[in-house]
Amino acid sequence: MKSALLILSLGLAGMIQAQKIHYNLRMTKPQNHYFEVEMQISEFKAGDLTVKMPVWAPGSYLVREFSKNVNLVRAYDEKGAELKVGKTSKNAWKVSAGKAKKVNVQYEVYAFELSVRTSFLDLTHGFVSSSGVFCYLDGHKDKSGTVTVFPYKDFKVITTPLEKATVQTQEERSETFQFPNFDVLVDSPFEIGNQEVFDFTVDETKHTVAMYGSGNYDIDELKVDMARIVKAENNVFGGKNPNKNYTFIVHNVVDGQGGLEHANSTVLSVNRWTYGGGYKDFLSLVAHEYFHLWNVKRIRPIQLGPFNYDEENYTSLLWVMEGFTSYYDELLLVRAGYYTKEEYLRKLQGTLNYVEGSVGARVQPVAHSSYDAWIKGYRPNENSANTTMTYYSRGAILGAYLDAVIIDKFNGTKCLDHFMQYLFEEFYTKKNRGFTEDEFQAALEKFLGQDMDYFFDKYVNGTEIPNYNEVFGKIGVGVTYTGKAVVSFGASLSQDGGNCMVKGVRAGSAAETAGLSVGDEIISVDNMRVNNSALESYVGGLGEGETCKLLIARDELILELEVKMSMYERPAFKLEPNGSAKNKFDYWLRSI
């Protein structure tokens, strides 16, 4: 890797000497799935220096150990002499620079996991999730710099939200981009290949859309619909958008995996056929990730920027960051004209019933769910449904709850939009920082002019079910409880190779009491061979207190269990207009 790369890099380093950090990114053999990275460092104190690879990607709250993909780390001085490199921790390398004035660190990154948060390279395209590709100089994340991308010979297009540098290399087809600090670089993905690119402009912000992969999308339709979503979102914040340019990178693949937000871009991963029957889901995803350019990238907990890339960054406010965003990603489709009011109420009802019908909702407060995202939310196990509650859905319901409180408080003249504007102005515009948990509550109380301890004690730090009818009834929505106690087995089943397998056991259920566990194979019930549908039908005909005998296989041992059927009531609600407070109802579900 040294020879030709080193000669070119030393020449380029001289050309960009005004910059303190420069990266060269190559992909000479994409079939091997390796990005070749050079990190050129200048203007540092003589002696040792340390470079580090982040262990996580902001917006995805899991330590992913990106350094596991790094190989062949080498370093050279400005004369081409090799310097000693030693690893000092799982994600750090110390370079013995001595009296060197410039250091060129070279390494390879294996990239063969295509997701919105991990990098990928093959003969069809390259995707760079920057947190897992670019190292930083320890103690100097504030250094500005440039990145030069040298595409594989068959790749014609480079898409990134980074600005082009004023000085470019002379090598054909390469492009150089600039960044003010490492936080901006790591927040800027790259799509490199032959993606289809189009653009549209809304309120003076240019939006570039890069579509990788074939699909049943219609560009003319996307331009119109994505622009309407963007317009609706700008209106939430008084028509103001902090970006002059914004980039969508869309991966159209077999198995779509959601999205990841960045300050002036997003990466979306969707099923390539989603633009048919699942088109509104795609628009909801667009709305969700775009909303993050305000909520989480600028309106944010103080822990979420500037980041510590070496370890977890804990906050108990993800229910606001992701939850409020989830609330808006469907509400905005009403405002943009893609959902009717009735359709939206059915959507909100579904979210409400998912939340309150979850066993884990009575166990894990949403503040704890936020804080434990690193160890529970992103690392679920077979018991997670019994003990955890997603901050996405619970936060969305709490967002709707607060929206109703605000609309009622101000008699249909203000809503959650105005509180979001208030947070943006008070913390991002005036202070340019995030807020603490106490500051968030204080801001809400100041905005509303009332104490909100009950809300945080009961619903954020507690697990109580709110009186939804009382709150939503004031904005014209009746909430009727529809939960009923039924005889329940309490285990979810799947068919695997003809075998009836247990994939979930509800806490406190008849199945759990009998000793049934996830992973058990159910061979027969009351001496009758069954598959999963037959078993569900059989136990569904039993009454409270009646029993059945299960023959199961566990770890290749045969066991017999007796199940005594019990009652279970899953909370459920129905939402429908109640005919009152029509002005507030119409204000809530207004269109642009």
Residue ranges and their predicted role:
Residues 42, 76, 150, 551-553:
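A generic structural motif
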Residues 19-56:
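Early extracytoplasmic/domain-onset interaction patches
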Residues 329, 339-592:
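C-terminal recognition in membrane/secretory proteostasis and scaffolding
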Residues 21-23, 35-39, 103-105, 145-147, ...:
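Hydrophobic residues positioned within well-ordered beta-strands of beta-sheet architectures
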Residues 320-341:
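Extended catalytic-interface subdomain
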Residues 63-72, 76-229, 235-243, 255:
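Non-catalytic architectural context of zinc metalloproteases
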Residues 39, 196-318, 324, 328:
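Juxtacatalytic substrate-recognition/specificity segment
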Residues 1-22:
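Bacterial Sec-dependent N-terminal signal peptides
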